[in-house]
């Protein structure tokens, strides 16, 4: 005999689905609008969601090709968007790898070792991480200006300097990985030690392979944060050819000439690396997010 759902339950189900559809539409509308702007003729921010005439001129300029107009005019690419995109991927990738390496080793020390001041250090790291990076811009500029005199590859207007600055924000990741490490039974490392493994071997061959989900989460979050960051990169990078895409895209929004179409095409390009990284790591993402809670 078939089960008949009461009307109240059907109403709740309908309301839930309706709210979810509205939520998804609210998320998708800005993305679709940006794509629509990149496909319109001219550099206009307003217009219909579906362009009357699809034009690829903004995409051609973003990809480094010149555009020839009907009257014979040729518009060269105004900015090296693909170079900016490569700079973003390089900086974000190296930063994410470095943050994962530093955070993992620090978290292992806090989770497995005993030393004086451990609790104070943990709390201090978390407190300092709560202050926005904008408050430290003047100090960062002075620091990298002086540092560049001795180590030019990490000075001003270098990607090394930007990466070095980004890698300072590891406190939250250390807490997250530490919480994950504490969920792993220490007897596994003790068994490895009985078999003759050193602490480093137990960490590298036992703990790290079991922690891949949370490391994937930290990598993704670090990659996204680095590839979308603007204040620090715009402070340290001065040469147009060294810009990351997030910084370079601001060149399209000159007060005398807002190039909204070109800006939209570059914005869509900037989302491609994040999407690719997310898709490659999604198999570990859910497990890592649910298992990375910090224990009390």
UniProtKB/Swiss-Prot annotation:
Residues 36-88, 144-152, 228-257 are periplasmic. GO terms for biological process: maltodextrin transmembrane transport. The chain crosses the membrane at residues 13-35, 89-111, 124-143, 153-175, 205-227, 258-280. One of its GO terms (molecular function) is ABC-type maltose transporter activity. Keywords: Cell inner membrane, Cell membrane, Membrane, Sugar transport, Transmembrane, Transmembrane helix, Transport. CDD domains: TM_PBP2 (cd06261). Residues 1-12, 112-123, 176-204, 281-296 are cytoplasmic. Residues 85-281 form the ABC transmembrane type-1 domain. GO terms for cellular component: plasma membrane. It is a multi-pass membrane protein. It is found in: Cell inner membrane. PANTHER family: MALTOSE TRANSPORT SYSTEM PERMEASE-RELATED (PTHR32243), MALTOSE_MALTODEXTRIN TRANSPORT SYSTEM PERMEASE PROTEIN MALG (PTHR32243:SF50). Belongs to the binding-protein-dependent transport system permease family. MalFG subfamily. The complex is composed of two ATP-binding proteins (MalK), two transmembrane proteins (MalG and MalF) and a solute-binding protein (MalE). Part of the ABC transporter complex MalEFGK involved in maltose/maltodextrin import. Probably responsible for the translocation of the substrate across the membrane. This is Maltose/maltodextrin transport system permease protein MalG. It comes from Klebsiella aerogenes (Enterobacter aerogenes). The gene is malG.
């Amino acid at each position: 005999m078939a089960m008949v759902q009461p009307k109240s339950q059907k109403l709740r189900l309908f309301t839930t689905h309706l709210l979810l559809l509205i939520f998804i539409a609210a998320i998708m509308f800005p993305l679709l609008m940006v794509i629509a702007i990149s496909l319109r003729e001219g550099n206009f921010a307003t217009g219909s969601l579906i362009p009357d005439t699809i034009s690829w001129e903004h995409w051609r300029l973003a990809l480094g090709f010149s555009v020839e107009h009907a009257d014979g005019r040729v518009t060269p690419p105004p900015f090296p968007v693909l170079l900016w995109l490569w700079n973003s991927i390089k900086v974000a990738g190296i930063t994410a790898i470095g943050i994962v390496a530093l955070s993992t080793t620090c978290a292992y020390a806090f989770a497995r070792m005993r030393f004086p001041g451990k609790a104070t250090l943990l709390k201090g790291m978390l407190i300092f991480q709560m202050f926005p990076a904008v408050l430290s811009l003047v100090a960062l500029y002075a620091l990298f200006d002086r540092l560049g005199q001795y180590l030019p590859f990490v000075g001003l207007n270098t990607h090394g300097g930007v990466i070095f600055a980004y890698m300072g924000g590891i406190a939250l990741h250390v807490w997250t990985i530490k919480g994950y490490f504490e969920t792993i039974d220490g007897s596994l490392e003790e068994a490895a030690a009985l078999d003759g493994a050193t602490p480093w071997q137990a960490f590298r061959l036992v703990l790290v392979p079991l922690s891949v989900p949370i490391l994937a989460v930290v990598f993704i979050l670090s990659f996204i944060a680095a590839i979308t960051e603007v204040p620090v990169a715009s402070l340290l990078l001065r040469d147009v050819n060294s810009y990351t895409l997030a910084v370079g895209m601001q060149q399209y929004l000159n007060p005398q000439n807002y190039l909204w179409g070109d800006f939209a095409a570059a914005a869509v390009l900037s989302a491609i690396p994040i999407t690719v990284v997310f898709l490659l790591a999604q198999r570990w993402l859910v497990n890592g997010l649910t298992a990375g809670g910090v224990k009390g």
